[in-house]
Amino acid sequence: MCGLTGIIGFEDINIFKRLHLESENRGYDSSGIVIIKENSLFHIKDSLKTSELWNSKKLKDFLKLINKDHVKFDKKTFFLGHSRMETNGFSIFQQNNQPIIENNTMVMHNGILTDNPEHTDYTLSDTRLICKQISSYFNKKFFDFKNFNNYFKSLKGYHSLIFTNTLSSELYLISNNKNIWYYHNDE
């Protein structure tokens, strides 16, 4: 399925780029990048393989725009990447590519919903449904993790999620298939 990557606390975007490119074999249908800095969320997505996105004029312009806004990458910068293998929702529709952002909530998803009665339009991404639901659990700066966790446990299929809300300074990672690998460096 899809590839989710992320790195927090590095000033050099090239470290993230190498990590994101390594995830390309997890999905060739589309890719996306999120940069979170001081509660500002910048994102780009396209129906391109990860390597094509990194070599695109669109990404170069995106990074120039961020630099024009004097955004400096530092130890509080989050870099997140997605490499999508199309399951539900056609990647030719940009609305289905990730990250999905709705009501100040950003979601990147690896997995597939199965047997979900809410999912009746299969031209739409199942991630859009998940994002809509997650956004309902954010109330200003408070996240209702208990009710979200009940919702997450009710999902049929396999899922790993990275999500945040622009009103919050927290980033959430959750999986129901135990496939989240991470490394923490105390430096």
Model-predicted regions and their roles:
Residues 1-187:
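Conserved short alpha-helical segments that host acidic/polar catalytic motifs at enzyme active sites
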